Structures are given as C-alpha cells and as structure tokens.
Amino acid sequence: MTNYSLRARMMILILAPTVLIGLLLSIFFVVHRYNDLQRQLEDAGASIIEPLAVSTEYGMSLQNRESIGQLISVLHRRHSDIVRAISVYDENNRLFVTSNFHLDPSSMQLGSNVPFPRQLTVTRDGDIMILRTPIISESYSPDESPSSDAKNSQNMLGYIALELDLKSVRLQQYKEIFISCVMMLFCIGIALIFGWRLMRDVTGPIRNMVNTVDRIRRGQLDSRVEGFMLGELDMLKNGINSMAMSLAAYHEEMQHNIDQATSDLRETLEQMEIQNVELDLAKKRAQEAARIKSEFLANMSHELRTPLNGVIGFTRLTLKTELTPTQRDHLNTIERSANNLLAIINDVLDFSKLEAGKLILESIPFPLRSTLDEVVTLLAHSSHDKGLELTLNIKSDVPDNVIGDPLRLQQIITNLVGNAIKFTENGNIDILVEKRALSNTKVQIEVQIRDTGIGIPERDQSRLFQAFRQADASISRRHGGTGLGLVITQKLVNEMGGDISFHSQPNRGSTFWFHINLDLNPNIIIEGPSIQCLAGKRLAYVEPNSAAAQCTLDILSETPLEVVYSPTFSALPPAHYDMMLLGIAVTFREPLTMQHERLAKAVSMTDFLMLALPCHAQVNAEKLKQDGIGACLLKPLTPTRLLPALTEFCHHKQNTLLPVTDESKLAMTVMAVDDNPANLKLIGALLEDMVQHVELCDSGHQAVERAKQMPFDLILMDIQMPDMDGIRACELIHQLPHQRQTPVIAVTAHAMAGQKEKLLGAGMSDYLAKPIEEERLHNLLLRYKPGSGISSRVVTPEVNEIVVNPNATLDWQLALRQAAGKTDLARDMLQMLLDFLPEVRNKVEEQLAGENPEGLVDLIHKLHGSCGYSGVPRMKNLCQLIEQQLRSGTKEEDLEPELLELLDEMDNVAREASKILG
C-alpha cells in the first residue's frame, strides 16, 4: 500500500507539470495561429476587393455590366481557393453583377435598413467571411465631411461584396492541433521513462528496507539492510541497521529481566493463592451474612408485623366493649403505639428494599387529580385535628391522565405532608402541583409542600436526607419517627427520574418541592361531570382562610358560574344567590347545630347551600341536611368533590329522571350477567322497570350460550366470575356474527384507573361501577338504545353521590335507594346478604385458625358485591380494603386485625338487620 502510494505521487509530480505546460502551450499556439490565418485571409480579401472597387468605378458610372462581370470573373478564378463569390450592387442596393450565380446573392446583400459602408467592413458567419467596400465616384473624397445625405447618395455608386471560404483555415487549424497533440504525447512518454527510472531507483531500496523491518518485527533481530544506496536512502539504511542492533541488545537484556521477573512471580503467585483461599472464605462468610440479613428482614416482616397486627386488631375489638375511661385511654395509647411501631417497621423494610435495589415501581394508568385527592383526604383528618388548614391546588394545565406508580406517589406526598403536620402547630399546609415540562409522550410535574411550622436551622439542613438522622435529636423524643421518611422519599423521587429539595427558615416554615417524570396516557380514564347547567348561575363563596379560598376560586374559575367571594359571612353582599358555599374554619370547634341563626340566614339567601366542613365537623352532616343544607363537603375542596356537588344543584332544581311506566319502557333486549345472586336479582329488578325484555345469566358460559341463541341490544357483564371471567365471555360473544356490534358494559366494583383502561382495551364498550344506581343505569340505557347513534365509547356522566356515613353498620335509606325505592326488594337483598354471611364466617375462621383455605379472596369479592346493594357501608369498606390488600400480594396472616373486625361487623349487621326484617 505504501509503495503504491509513493509511486502514484511520483508519477503525478512528474506528469502533471509536463501535461499542464504542454497543454497550455498547445492551446496558446493553436489559438494564435488560427487568429493569424484569419487575419491573413482578411488581408488577402482586402487586397482583392479594394483595387476592384477602384477598377469598377468607371464601369458603374457607365452602367457597363459586361466589363465589370469580366473583371470580377477573372479575379474569382485567380483566387478560387479562397473566394466563393464576388457581387456588385448599385446605389439602390440591387444586384448589378455577380461571379457565381449558383450561390444566393441575397446572403451578401445588405439589409434594407442598413446604410451603405463608407469603408471596408468585415462580417463572419460560421465558415464564411464577407467583405464589403463602397464604390465611390472620383469626385468624392472620404476625408470630406458631407453636409447632407443627398450629397452622399450622389457620390456613392454602389458597393462590392466579397465572400471568402474559411474551410482552408479550419483545416490548417486541425492540422496544427494534431501536431501539438503528437508533440505533447511524445513529451509525456519521455517524462514517463524518466519517472519510471526514478521510481525504480527510489522504491527498490525502500522495498528492501521494508522487508528488513518486517523481518525484525517478526523477531529476526539479526536481519540487516544490504546493498549500495545513494544520499538520504543510505542514511536511512544505516539508521535501520543501528535500530536493529539496539533492539537485539534490548531484547537480550529484556529476556534476562523476564526470567528474573518470572522467578519472582512464581513466588508471588504462591502467596496470592494463599490469599485467594482466605478471600474466598471471607466472601462466603459475607454472603452467608447477607443471606442471614435478608432472612432476618423477611422474618422480621412476618414475626413483628403479625403480632403487631394481632395487638392492633384485639385492641380495636376490646375498645368496642364496655370499658372505664381509664381503660379506654390505656387501650387508645396501646393502639397508637402499635401503629407507630408498625409504621417504623414498614419504613425500615422500605429502606432495605431501596438499598438493595429490589423495589420495583409500577407503570399503570391513573388519574393524577383523583390520586392526589385521595391521599390529601386521608391526611386531612390529622391536619384538621391540629387546627391546620390543608389545601391542594392543581393547576389547570397539569395533565390528569398519566402513567406511573400512584401508590408510591401517594407515599411521597404522605411522607412530606405528614412531616409538615408533625412540625406545624398552627397555620396552613399548602400543596401546589404545577406542570414543569411537557412533550408528546411525557410530562414533568413539580409538587410543592409549604408549611408554617418550626422550620429547620441552616446548620441542620445538610443532614436532613441522611438515614436514621433528624435535624434535632430531641425531635424523635417529642414527635417520634426514625428519620427514614425523607430518605425513602428522596430515593423514591430519584427512582421516578426526578429530584427533591427544600428551603426552610426557623420559626417561619419550610417548603419542600420535588419533580417527577410521568408518561402521558392518550386514553381518557376519568371525565368530570358536565357543568354546562351552571351557566348563568350565581354562587356566593365564604371562606376565612385566604389560601383555601384561592384554591377554591381557581377551581370555580373553570366553571361558567358568576362567583361572589367574601372572607366573612357578615361581609357578604345581601342578595339572593342560586348557590352558596360556606367554608367553616378548621379552628372552629363549636357544634354547627349551635349556629342555627347564621345557617338559617344563609339558607334564606340561596336555593342551594353547601358547607365545606373540616373532618371533626362531619359528625353533624346528617343533622345539617335535615335543617336544609344541600350538601356537606369535606375540606380541602378539590375538583373531584366540588364539581359533583355543584352539578347536584341542577338535579335539585329539576328531576331529570321521570318515573318509568310500562308505556315508557325502552324497546331493548338486555342481558345481565353476574355470579352473585343478590347482584343479579337487583340488576334484573332495575332492568324490568326500564326495558321491555331482560335475560339473566349467572355465569360466563351461560351468557355465551344465550348470546348464540338470540341477539341483544346491550349486555351488562360482571368481570370477576368463576370458570369464565367477564373479559373472556365478552371476547367469545363478539366472535358471534350477530353479536359483533353488541355493546358490552363492564360492571365492576373495582373502578380503578388501570382496570378501567384494561377493560376498555379488552373490548368492553363502557363500564358501570358497583353499586349500580338507578339513575346511572337509566342514563346508560338511553345512550346505548338502538338508534341513539352511539357507536364508540362514551364516558358515563357523573351522577351525584348521596352522602353516606362510612361508619354506619346499616343505612336503611341507602339500601332503599340502591333498591330503586322498592322496600320488598331492599328486604330481599338484605336477607340474601344474611344468608351468605355464615359461609363467609366459616372461611374467615378457618383462615384465623391457620388452615389457609383456598378461595378467600373470591369469597370476599362476592361479599363485597353483596354489600354494595344492602346498605351496609362499613362492612362494604372493610371488604374492599381486605380484597385490595389480598390482590396486591399481602399475605392472609398479615390481615388478621381486619378479618377479626370483619367478623365483628358481621355480627353487628345481623343484629341491626334483625330489627328491620323482624
């Protein structure tokens, strides 16, 4: 490769100048010679035409064509090698005589508008040259300046045109080009001979030296460059030979050193083998210690949590018995201490998982606003108990449908807000959620938690995110905790691709903020209620806390309401309002029933009064509703709570659902599928009043067989059924030719965001949450009735939820509403629930006895569904909690307190139901 490159460079350096110079000289001489030939031809033509013009002056004066014709013919024959034609034109530009009638004389004639030449003119056209000169009488001198055109025309007798042939010039040019090319090729050949000789004298020795260097590279250190060389090549030869001699000496010395090093290495290897054996033993001991540590943590999770759950469970059971105040106080202390210890154990286990890298984040679709609303609602109790106002402000540009780990996000919020509650004695705890960055597939959100607590001194801020450390050692004694909460929070935020920081001033409060990255979910998970009915309505809003008021006003600004805000009720402009939202301060501790005059005045000023109550005031909700309050909302107010309450005003003003008569039944054939007899009976009873034909199936197999026999306008499908679940049944039904377009509605009590998307992706047209309410079902039937034009999924509009006391054992009004106001149906549903309780009790008692029976989660799910239609909210919530824990992987033995509480609640339900059923 090197030889070829050198050869090519030498050839280029030799040939390029030769070719370039020869080419330039050839072009110069050819062009110069061509111009000389043309000039010679032009001079020859001039020597012919100018004497001819003088000679023809006399003949033109006499108009003697014959004499002039003979003259030009003689000249044409004498110069026939270059002359093609000679033509004479008179003073009127007419052909007078020509020497060659075979050529078109008009090519030599001047144009009609071209003046006669006053002297010799030359024109060229391709291989033709035309010379023209005037014929002037002897009385005219060219040096004179004629005073008029008339005088010129009198002295101008005509002109002579001579046409010359340039082909001979072209031929001579080609001949000289050919000679130039031959000479240039000859020079190139001579240059090639010299270049070849030079390359042989240079590349030959170089090739010899390259071969010698290659032999030296292969280890033949005795190789030398031989032969006679000139100049620098001889110097290079001597250098290579000297290098080979040096390499040979170095190689000999190196070999000696290698032998010595090999001997030393053998001794070192023997020592390393001994050390490796010791390291291997130490590694095995370390692995065994790590294994024992992992087993210890796993055992601690079970051995500590199980007895703690037992302590908590039996403490709760004991608290339900008759106790003295001292005993109740002691038991409450035991329960709080056990819960604190359980929280510490959970923190330690989470920290261990994070340290080991075994904590895996989920990636599921979820509604961001509902998720944050849920965790803030849980934290509101402890915040309001301390008299702290808790607010949640989610900016309107923050996307709601996202994909991530909602439980870990809630854990982060819980840790940060829990710390804020712990270290704040009065004031506010404000949560602000903003969009930081947005792309087509991802969103980065920033969450700020601001409190008015004790703050953190600057000297203690550096160790805030260290494990088992707190800013002040006395904090753990006063407030409890392990110092792991912020460490776990920081690691969770980092796992979500974000970071966390804070700013704090002693005695002024702290602000913690973090940002995380979430994927955008293109599908709609939850749509809010329609607020168009609020257009043109006036709302009076009273809230003494400015931060809480601002958050609520931001929500109201997204509605068409006209809002009148006042920080106090007394400052509210006296007028009549369509709606009024009255916020009660969290520091207000008097019973609201004592504010009778104030509430009565508020009721008189509006058609629909809503109260925003702190948690400790919720006990008065039922009594307040009896006094004319339209809705009692739990603080902090969020869109998921406030907007449905506002739209309830529309239903308060007009009844959108008219009683269904036999004549108003929808012309539909609907099939309902549910393995729970109570659920199936209720759905069937509701459908009988709304549609003309109803088919009931208690299994997925039966539903598929019935779908083969007849077409349906709509199918209500339970999801969790034995043998064949609702998703599989939906797939098989849609495979039937006459059922391909039949809408299948998923009926589920687990309307979690991720499951909703899974159901819609599996072929379900829509979903209906349990417990089924009459108004929801009727709206669904209206949208999917034949001819309604609904061909794609439509999100079920929100129906206002009734106020339910979650701690009520039996709410007969709720049971009646769930049974569409039918007393007999409500009694039947309650009786079916009581008949099912013994089976559940046996299974739960087997679990508590350590027998680990199969099918517990399915039985709890079935009980959960039955509770949804029987007006037993407390037992329904217990079933939901137990089922969620079991499906999330929690072991049955870890749920011992909840199962004991469920057994106790079964007894309470049976006792309360006996009073109604007799």
UniProtKB/Swiss-Prot annotation:
EC number: 2.7.13.3
Gene it is expressed from: barA
SMART domains: HAMP (SM00304), HATPase_c (SM00387), HisKA (SM00388), HPT (SM00073), REC (SM00448)
Source species of the chain: Shigella flexneri
Residue spans, topological domain Cytoplasmic: 1-10, 197-918
Domain Response regulatory: 669-785
Name assigned to this protein: Signal transduction histidine-protein kinase BarA
Primary role: Member of the two-component regulatory system UvrY/BarA involved in the regulation of carbon metabolism via the CsrA/CsrB regulatory system. Phosphorylates UvrY, probably via a four-step phosphorelay.
Maturation and modification: Activation requires a sequential transfer of a phosphate group from a His in the primary transmitter domain, to an Asp in the receiver domain and to a His in the secondary transmitter domain.
Domain Histidine kinase as annotated: residue spans: 299-520
Enzyme kind, highest EC tier: transferase
Positions of transmembrane segments: 11-31, 176-196
Gene Ontology molecular-function annotations: ATP binding; phosphorelay sensor kinase activity
